[in-house]
Amino acid sequence: SREELIISEIKKNPGIRFREVMEKISLSNGVLSYYVRKLENNGVIRTQRTTRVSRFFINDMTEEESKVVSRLRQTTPKAILVTLLENDRLEFQEIVANVGKASATVSFYLTKLVNDEIVSYKKVDLKKNYFVVEKKRIANLITEYHPDVVENASDNLADIMSSL
């Protein structure tokens, strides 16, 4: 059924956007809207709405996990998290160098990761050293929902994941 197709797609890709679901299972906007509303009302799925994006999750995922998975679907936050998992604590400029994006871009997403309580920092000699708050949980979510990250990452990250 269409409902099962939608649920299956959201399970495989938590944090998937409306348009992505529409394209992957070839449903029109109106038809998908109808089923999304129905599944939400029945408590099967949850929608995380921001000003520009709606993301869908199966209801068994916690709010915290949803935040992490949403960030992992974005290139720069994913790169920041992988960098911080590979290197225990880094200063801002070190993150910028590793991620390879403009400092303003890294700053924008790093602030979001800190606000989401996924990343934190400690001040050392007037500089902030950033780190992943719950390494094991983040590593597990990456392994479960983004195995490509582990496959494409350095051996260092693979070693870290297996040691946690």
Where do the language-model regions lie?
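Short, cationic-aromatic polyanion-contact patches
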Residues: 1-3, 17, 48-75, 124-146
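Long, low-complexity, charge-rich intrinsically disordered regions
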Residues: 1-12, 79-83, 103, 112-164
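Short capping segments at the starts of secondary-structure elements
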Residues: 13-17, 87-91
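Acidic (E/D-rich), amphipathic helical modules within compact regulatory domains
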Residues: 17-61
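A short acidic, leucine-rich amphipathic alpha-helix
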Residues: 20-24, 94-99
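Short amphipathic alpha-helical interaction segments
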Residues: 27-38, 100-114
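Extended, charged alpha-helical interaction scaffolds
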Residues: 89-95, 101, 105
